[in-house]
């Protein structure tokens, strides 16, 4: 709704809209070296939903009247060249102060990368219809051609929900987005990763969940996101999924489809340059089918498009050809990238300003990418040889940079140049996965499609197992050569699915084919996993006896001499833990003595073992005050995040009423990153989610759902089953 004049002369609407947008930024930016892109001419035009030429007349009038001022400044994320930016003056603010905004209800809260609001033209009926459906509790798939304005309409609907006090959780998809990534956008860092836990944490009445750009999902992750939407469909929140037709998951169950078409002729006119006469405007709008992006890209200096000319053909024949060589080079670099880029990341920055001035780029903060229609048209114009050459050049360029993101980019371009390098993947995939396992999964999936190398498929299977993706892991395991490696992965898959008996049978078969040293290592790893495969609390005596007998049966002498001490250490740690839990003081003392002899009395780990012994002696369900004081000091002194978490968990287990310092200590490590490629860390992560459910009872169900998922990912099916039982009893 337009503001109403309370006193004084009314400014033209175009000028009022400019002033209202500029007034959202503080006066301190008038002398700032770096200013937001929204104050640049392309950013201002974008937010107002007009072409840049439509700003010239109202801006000139506002500047002549002293309502705005212009200067050259560096635009954040826009490269090194200074650009013209616009500021509202005190006089401009005074002019706005005479305007009275309609009263609004308390504004709701938004989460995630919610785009900047822009003014829509000719979409009032669509916005009202879509808003009415969502606010009434429906779930909707918003579909349409690329560039037709789906995201802009979704943003307008989100604004309507916010103005009515709703909570809006927004996620935008890319090729590396998975269900867990959507959860982080909806809920923030530390969000759960399983679909059921994500929905449990984000669901609520008067809540709108938005999933934008769903067509960008890689097939590797589409099924997981579809599962997320299936989980959300019957819940309290309304869900808006936005996708180019057809969507990667069809029309989800419980969703209705809302197809967005081109603009009507009377509304298309407002997107053309202001100096376009009415006859030309009608012909152009009809020729381009009312397509909003194509209309914004048309210039009055160009020929009127042929009637019936497809929008894609118009983009290729006209928009692309008007670019300079520098603009085309920068556009190609954007188009081959797997994700949006900062301008500072470009190797060919010269054409970035030209692309921005031409309304070819879309922005999210400082990250930019071409509008997807333009990107798709440009990609489609390349021959296979041209595409291969571009990717090969980009791979070489990114190889000169450091860091996991650079390796992700290098890997993408290497694979898409048709030359997946198994040795390179083996060397770098863990660093990529540690920063973004979803990106690593996509990279491996692309490499598997192009290479017959067994090691690449093994890496793809291992990553799927670590991520808890049973179906994907199985598809890769089935294509591996028969042997020990395949059997061990099949055993992991069985445990992931909760079939411990089959897993044990497969492992026994695999061990029969191992060397004695390999068999010993596998036995120790199995013992450690079985010891951890339970919820916090006293160990079952039967399990304790089984593990003790199994530990005593391990033949350490079969290991190479250099590895025997670490093998003995692992077994003695298990013996010590079991003895403490069942109250077997003599056995605990023997294990402690063996550990002290192996590590030395002054080793930092001995202090931890001594503390565990003191914590095991409890009165009334709680460890002594002296033991808790020592625990607090030891926790605060530990820098290793894994060790600190294990200590915190040990103290939580030793107390029925948890002191404030302990609760705060756990909160401080609740979202600290752990390595998914390490089995020990996967188990630790599952236990951490369990304790979050204990300490945060209002979110217990969501946290424990995630804990169940994490226990399965850690191959702890017994702990997962036990926790499911506790959840059922709690409900």
Specify the residue positions occupied by each region the protein language model found.
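C-terminal boundary/linker of central alpha/beta nucleotide-binding cores
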Residues: 65-69, 313-381, 389
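A short hydrophobic beta-strand->loop->alpha-helix junction that borders the nucleotide-binding pocket
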Residues: 168-178
